[in-house]
Amino acid sequence: MVKRVAGLRHLILLLCLMMVAVIGVSSNLTLMPEASYQSVSDHTQYQLEPEQRLTPQALIEGQYSDDWQRVGEAINFGYTTDAYWYRVRLENPTGSRSERLLEVDYPLLDHIEFYEVRKGKVRDQAITGDQHPVSSRPMRHRTFVFPVAMPANGSTDVYLRVTTAGSHQVPLALWKPDAFYEANEKDMVGRSMFYGMLVIIVIFNGFLYLVLREKSYLYYVLTNATLLVLMASLHGVAFQFLYPEQPEVNERVTLISSALITLFFSLFARTFLGIDERMRVANWLFRGLVYASSVNVIGSVFLSYDVSTRASVALAVLVSLAMLSVGLVMAAKGDRAARYFMAAWILMLVGVMVWLANLIGLLPASFWTQH
């Protein structure tokens, strides 16, 4: 019996050692020479910074080695102002020096500290974020891109410290430079087409409003114009090209457009569906949403980023749910305008709900949840 217990203990110890070994290996990212793109997040470790400010040297020396945890598939902690440290070891198995681009594909992070470490020493570092001018970025891009070099048959450790007042998500990817530039060109073409489509919608419906003088066209124009500004801000494009050295302007544009979109969307839905004439309770609901959105617009001019974004997210959830509920009820009653409205807007409303769930950390960061 004693031998069996001892044998069981040895087996458990062996399994634990194997698990530790597997975790240690999987936390390193080995470069694949032929791969143009590799996901980094699932090879990354993180730790929450305690009350005292940590230094990169303390982490490099292993003073807090027991506090590192595995990230998993995606880095998304929702709305938090806490500081997080991230690290990943990039291993180069080839006999030649390799250069890659590490991209943090989320343009709304306030402060990012980047440290490139080899043999226990910081070889390169950068401090950037959307609270810093675009010129602070190692590469002038709408997201945050850091060049990383790996010696032949060697490794490089990357440390990141991230703080933000908004949604804390850090999608990490490693690119070959040529592949990144090619993907960026295609990305900008797609975004330009999207922005151009919104401009055409605004101009066309603006002319319709001037001819017909119907308020629904005016609110539709204002909704799409605000959507254009908001998406360009959220994607980091407006900051990159319009006011790259004025992060405070970029912040206010994002906050004000986030507040305005719920106001104009509520006015458009209320007018287009004729809610004030057909549904008394729904009319009170939408009037309340319009008043609340108006107050939020005023607050977005001077309130902090944290408070204003949370208010805008809460209102966006309420407006989306109200539109879906009222639209479906009116469509079920046979209202033709409601059927047209739901056919045109239901996918967008569902998409908004998915995107909001991503912002607050309920869904992981991905292309589909961010776009």
Predicted features along the sequence, with ranges:
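Carboxylate/His-rich catalytic cores and anion/metal-binding grooves
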Residues: 111-115, 218, 223-232
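N-terminal signal peptide c-region/cleavage motif recognized by signal peptidases
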Residues: 19-24
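Soluble non-transmembrane domains of integral membrane proteins
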Residues: 25-190
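Interfacial "cap-and-anchor" motif at the non-cytosolic start of specific transmembrane alpha-helices
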Residues: 229-271, 275-371
